[in-house]
Amino acid sequence: MRPLLDEAKRRVDRRLSASRQSLSTSRIFPSALPERLKDDHDAQVDYTAPPGGGGTKEGHFQYMQQSIFGMIAAVGSQSDFHARFDDSSDSERDTDRPPQKRTEKESQATDAPPSSKNEKKALRSPQRPKSPSQERGRRHRKTLSGSRILRPLMPGSSQRQGGAQTEPSTGNQMSRVPSPERPRSTTPRAAPVLSRMVEAQALFDSKGSMNQSPRSPPAETQEEQSQEQTSASPLSLRLMEMFGFESPEKVLVEYACSLVQSMLLQGYMYVTEGHICFYAYLPRKSTVAIKSGYLYKRGRKNPKYNRYWFSLKGDVLSYYADPSNLYFPSGHIDLRYGISASLSEPKEKDREARDFQVTTDQRTYYFRADSSTSAKEWVKSLQKVIFRTHNDGDSVKISFPIESIIDIEESPMVDFAETFKIRAIESGETYAIDEYYFSFFNDGQDAFNFVKGLVSESQAKNPSRESPQPGRTTPQSRARGSRARWSLTSGLSQVLGSSDARRRRSASASQFSPGRDAAGLSPTSRQRDLSESFVNSFDQATESSTVLQSMTDTAESASQILNRSDVFQYPAMQPFRRQSLSEDQFGRRHSDETARSTNDIARLGPGITPRDVQRFYPPSDSDHDAQDAARVQQSASSLNELVRAGAYPLQRAAGLAEYLRNRSKQMGTLLASESMGYIEKVSGMWAGGRRHYGEAEGILPDDQDVDPEDKEDGCNHGDRFRAHFALPPTEKLQATYFAYLHRVLPLYGKIYVSQKKLCFRSLLPGTRTKMILPLKDVENVEKEKGFRFGYHGLVVIIRGHEELFFEFNAADVRDDCAVTIHQHLESVRFLSESGMLAEQEQDESEAAKAEHRMLQEARKDASGGLIPQTPSDESPEIHPIFDDPRASIINFKPTESLRITCLTIGSRGDVQPYIALCKGLLAEGHRPKIATHAEFEPWIRKHGIDFAPVEGDPAELMRICVENGMFTYSFLKEASMKFRGWIDDLLSSAWRSCQDSDLLIESPSAMAGIHIAEALRIPYFRAFTMPWTRTRAYPHAFAVPEHKMGGAYNYITYVMFDNVFWKAIAGQVNRWRQSELGLKATNLDKMQPNKVPFLYNYSPSVVVPPLDYPDWIRITGYWFLSEASDWTPPADLMAFIQRARDDGKKLVYIGFGSIVVSDPSALTRTVVESVQKADVRCILSKGWSDRLGDPASVKSEIPLPPEIFQIQAAPHDWLFSQIDAAAHHGGAGTTGASLRAGVPTIVKPFFGDQFFFGTRVEDLGVGICLKRLNVSLFSRALWEATHSERMIVKARNLGQQIRSEDGVATAIQAIYRDLEYAKTLARQRSIVSSTPFSPTPSAKTVAEQEVDDDVTDSEEWTFIGDETDIDISRRVRGRAVSDVDMLPEPLAVRSPELAQ
């Protein structure tokens, strides 16, 4: 048995190492199971079988334990669970061996020395263009070993020396991930195949010069620079490095200010002898949703607007048909290629604009908001995201020479800051005039006067500056000379702050003009580039348009395969160029070099001109000189304008004719090869299978049935994957599988597993289903039987969402997919727990922080320790202009003290949460009262809480269950005679106990609260310990199935239970309403229980809030009542605990509550033998021997061995903190206590909600849910709970989350927020159901005066929900209007008046 490792790093190393055992898809053992824990003869025996033989066919029986609903609902709660260990476990482990073999091969491949073709691509530097050999090396990357997930965790993965990035080693470090850029030949926004081939001609001549190295400055220049740097201040040296000055410049003054664009960028202005510089440190991009809500979107060809739910998250604007199903988007817009977001001019001038548009490099999207305010907020949010994506770094740098400033003037924009505008002219050939706005919260006038003085002096020195002569500089001279610069860079491209260190869109002025609009380009440049783009392509681009694919790739849908053919695409007009390429240069049709080189231009962003291409690719010696090239560009621009204004049909014909004339041979080869590719793609798509990808996203060499050409072209798989789902380049593809997704009907498609995402894309023609599921939202993966014969199922359990079902053709493919997802779940959880970022993200963040920190230190040294501060140093957000800095937080707390009644029935576990809540309400100044059974009165009053009695002893119901069995014939016979009187007493006593209340909070088990609140016209809340609200995420707690059944089944369990439960009590409740409450008879439609605000007192970390919960359903956290401070543990118990620690034995707690079993002695013997077999020490709470159903079954007690210590009672919060694992029945309170302590939990459920919480414990991976209780299974569960490091870590982390929650405080705030909504519902119901005998407020005029307001309020609130509820509310409002004249005179003044 391998030793257990405590350190998190070593744990993950063991889990992710190449030689690890494959993960099981059910429960994973940390090491081999001891021989003594193998299955014994009693593996199928259950010693908790019920008395009287009332069990089910599986020996599975349910008991009334803590809730009153057992008598009504237990017939629907009969459920079963998989055995934790059965005969199929060994076979499952065998099926996991192929991935292990693959991992070993990967490890061997990693240790081998890399070949020239497998060398990793080095980082692109602006001063070191890539050689052709390096460019060719892109397609042949070294595959990653099986421990690739652990690579970012290894120390020393990157080194930085002298501000430059060193190339990582091939064997031990991950290749540097490029910044967000266009996928190469696979971008969905690329031109058609023929057009891309023609466009590629422009790049072949320039590619030959890529291997030229930059010229180093002369030695004399270096010596002069070193002398200058010696005498310069640290701040001057730092600014020289950051902004690329030729020599250090003395810093005259600095100010804290904000650059005003479409948002405020807080930073610093540095005024040197020759430049004005601005620097702002930006945070990393957020991964949370920035904004979400409903919008209307116009179709691509249909002018009709359709309503969708939009979510702006990261760089992507996604939209959904159903807001509760956020893993299946209807589409997305990649804002990395966004140009602008702006409001549209309204058709009517007197109306405010509700329409806005988002322009990307290929398409304009049109939207409509519900209001002009909403439209403005969306536009601001989109502008901010587009700005961030253009930056894609962690800092903003601007510098321009003082001599280029034309003028400076004050430009007041906001009242709380002084703003002035600087107009500067760009040095170079365009002389574009740029405007910069700077806002100062302090010292604005001083800054204005100082800069204005410098400008005046500069103009006096250079009087002829206003009429500059055109001149040309090379890219290198421009990069080092005086020029206006707008550089949006990250820390990795820091030395000269130069352009495009990794081809990012945000470039310095050496490539782009600094005068940029929201697109980041100057208007003149943008107009010219758009016109050229208009000529170049008439492709009808779509969100998932055709992409250049590999000939044998199986990732194609049928519709995409047809779109691949160039015959079905519009030809593009070739722009007129002076030079042409030789035939042999362009002859390599099937080489990826052509497509990739073409796309290098596209990756630079929209509006890139031939001049920009020449800057990016330095011209070779054989090219024309710069002036000749400029004339060619001017000529081409003029001719393009003529073509654009000329005959449109001629463009298609000319383009096609020219192509057929010059490339007829390539055309024939293209059609012949692609037609064969279609057949291969379709056959491969339906053949299915699986593929794994290495670090460079090439197919691993040991994958079966892989075409050799696919291996060579494998690096494109990741690009296509990211293009399909608009994912960043950091998302690396790991594996793909072909499978069916079961929703309504099985949908064939492809599963993609990446580092952080689980994605699915349908491949059937006419379907557009896509799924993007973050792995952090996946709780577990389980293997199931397929829905269809011959198929193998896989269930993905998701946090707060219904399960997803996949079907595979082969069991080994299903098992491989399950193991792969499990492995990635472990790595994702470790990364999130340790707070580690992706390697590139971490490097960029640290580099930018280091640069910012060094600048701060230099400023501090220059100012003698005193530096000006920005209003918000290192602000976490970019602030929109004119927006309030933070919305005011409304205080919902009532001004007066409220009389709050909490109504509940049941056992001690049902009352304890209300005591904790009432103690919190007491602290808030309210007057709470608990109405429950009389036996709990001393306990309640001990905490200073008022008490009111409620009839109906639950012990009577327990006696019926014990003596007759659950839902047997004798049970139904006796219950029909005794239970009716029990309900009548409960309803009448509850009505009396709830008088003099301003607010009623009730457990649904009491059955009377909603009617009492209706009669008293007071707000009504519900609170419970188990799910009671309809959802597709979880089944009803009393109807947990043996297997996962999906969202439809989950939802129908609530509907069925509500109807069955109401039918059982409807007759008695309606008679009570009429006789005592003076209300009309009601039904479920009139009560609308699903509209009632609900408080669930369990942790959102245990039961994640479902996505389809409405706003008034709150999961607040556990309402724990801490009583350990008043309890002193016995000395013998403390001695037993200390002795176990001294012996090095694990300590467990076992207690199943007051359950009833047919043979208590057999259960005791099972516990004793299991403890001894697992070799643990046990604290036992043996409640099952104290309350036997049949006195004749009393037998002699089994003596307890010294390994077991029996206790009668102990506070859970103290006891569970002393143990290593807990085994209990799974009640809501006990489960919460064990999970809060952070110990693994074993649940053996007996009744009702215990099955639900047992399932949650197992799904979360923090414990085990046992189907049967015997020595074989129980001993194995005890051993695993105390030895499984994976389970122990998960339980510890979950305990930390639960302890950080404050459920009582959250519940109180939820009550305050929903109080007005609850009042509205109460008034609405009371108006509809009132009779002349109803108790109402004391004045008739008050009731009549509020009639109109009540009807209005009901319309406002009831429209929140589905259509069925709206129709119901309309019928209710109609009856309310007809019953207005029948409002009764008040008969009682005991009820409080409503808050007006």
UniProtKB/Swiss-Prot annotation:
The PH domain, residue ranges: 289-387
The reaction(s) this protein catalyses: a sterol + UDP-alpha-D-glucose = a sterol 3-beta-D-glucoside + UDP + H(+); ergosterol + UDP-alpha-D-glucose = ergosteryl 3-beta-D-glucoside + UDP + H(+)
Enzyme class label: transferase
Source species, domain of life: Eukaryota
Coiled-coil intervals, chain numbering: none
Keyword list, A-Z: Autophagy, Cytoplasm, Glycosyltransferase, Lipid biosynthesis, Lipid metabolism, Membrane, Protein transport, Repeat, Steroid biosynthesis, Steroid metabolism, Sterol biosynthesis, Sterol metabolism, Transferase, Transport
Gene Ontology terms describing biological process: autophagy; carbohydrate metabolic process; lipid glycosylation; protein transport; sterol biosynthetic process
Pfam families on file: EryCIII-like_C, Glyco_transf_28, GRAM, PH
Binding-site list for UDP-alpha-D-glucose: S907, R908, D910, A1210, H1212, H1225, G1229, T1230, D1249, Q1250
GO cellular component terms, A-Z: phagophore assembly site membrane
Family annotation (Gene3D superfamilies): Glycogen Phosphorylase B, Pleckstrin-homology domain (PH domain)/Phosphotyrosine-binding domain (PTB)
Membrane topology designation: Peripheral membrane protein
InterPro entries, alphabetized: ATG26_PH_GRAM1, ATG26_PH_GRAM2, EryCIII-like_C, Glycosyltransferase_28, GlycoTrans_28_N, GRAM, PH-like_dom_sf, PH_domain
UniProt keyword annotation of Electron transport present: no
EC assignment: 2.4.1.-, 2.4.1.173
Biased composition (Basic and acidic residues): 1-16, 35-44, 82-108, 585-595, 846-862
GRAM domain span: 237-288, 719-785
GO molecular function: sterol 3-beta-glucosyltransferase activity
Compositional bias ranges of the Polar residues kind: 18-28, 156-175, 459-479, 487-497
Location of the protein in the cell: Cytoplasm; Preautophagosomal structure membrane
Disulfide bonding pattern of the chain: none
Region entry Disordered, spans: 1-59, 82-193, 206-233, 459-531, 576-635, 841-880
Known role: Sterol glycosyltransferase responsible for the glycosylation of ergosterol to form ergosterol-glucoside.
Domain notes from UniProt: The GRAM and PH domains are required for the localization of ATG26 to the preautophagosomal structure (PAS) and are involved in autophagy.
Protein name, UniProt field: Sterol 3-beta-glucosyltransferase
Organism: Aspergillus terreus (strain NIH 2624 / FGSC A1156)
